[in-house]
Structures are given as C-alpha cells and as structure tokens.
Amino acid sequence: MAVSLASLFLLVCGVQSSHADSTHPRVSLETNLGTIVIELYPDKAPATVKNFLAYVDAGFFAGTIFHRVIKGFMIQGGGFGEDMQPKPTQKPILNEANNGLLNLRGTIAMARTSQPHSATSQFFINTKDNQFLNHKDKTSQGWGYCVFGKVVEGMDVVDAIESQKTTSRAGYQDVPDHPVTIVKAEQITLSPQEVH
C-alpha cells in the first residue's frame, strides 16, 4: 500500500508541474509564420516583465518585424516596422540580467546597445545556449542580457524564423529577405484547468 500511495503522490506532483503557474503571465506572439507563446518570469525580472507587458498591452509590437536573424544564435525583433524605421519607445529600463536566469535555447531576453541599462522594446529569442550573454559582473562588459521568460509553445516557429534567408537592408545586416512580421501580441488568460 505504501508503494501505491508513493506512486500516486509522484504522479500527482508530475501532473501539477506540467501545468502553467498562474504567477507567470503568458504572451502570444502571432507572426506571419505561426504563433509563439512565451511564459514570463515577473518574480525574477519584475521591471523587465512590466515593461514588456506594457508594450504588449499598448499594441506596440503589431506590425513590427524580426529584423535581425542569425542562424545558430538568435532571432531579434520588437523595434522596427517593415520599412526598417525604428518605432518610438518608452525610456530605457534597468538591466536585471543578474537574476540567475541564463540565455539558453528558447529563452527570451532584452536586446540593448553596448550600454547595460539601455533596453527599451527590442527582445531576442535564443536559438541555442548562449552562455557568453549571461551576467558575469556589474561592469559594462559583464552585465549580460536580461532573460525574462521562455518559449513554451511554438519553438518550431522560432526555428522557421531562424532558417529564413537574410540580406543587408537599410544599413542593417541579417535582415530576413521576406519580412517576418508580428501580426499581433497579446496576453493569454489561462483556463482554470491550466492553472494549479
């Protein structure tokens, strides 16, 4: 009987761990190549998640493209329209890369300039483990790039975007030949069955 109860306990725990955590909001990025669902970690990167959700809720990402795609590295978007003109953004946020999250395949992180605290709306999804992007120390060279979530559905779409042929356009390199556009970005409400 003890073995049966222990087995049942493990089974129940396993089922619960496969469901979404209600404290982790999810965002759907509908692109012209398919939909990517991202789970966010406000407990690890509160300012970054708040910033990202503000852009999502404002409809900012609709019509933006993945403007930088590098095979075996990452796909980057969230700042340019199909005309390769940057969209006006809110002020930069503090870099929360020292949160313990790593730039592993399928994670989403904030893009920025060489200044550590310069991220606004642009983000990237890692298509491989990119350890060199992780936080090392609080210097300009060591700050790293803040991971604030991960892809939970649609990694095949990320891979399809990564496989696009690229070119140089409007002074930018690694731009997909055919625009990969975010049609819509929105928060997803989880059903009671999905939340435990």
Predicted features and spans:
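Cyclophilin-like peptidyl-prolyl cis-trans isomerases
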Residues: 9-196
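Bacterial N-terminal signal peptides that target proteins for export
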Residues: 1-5
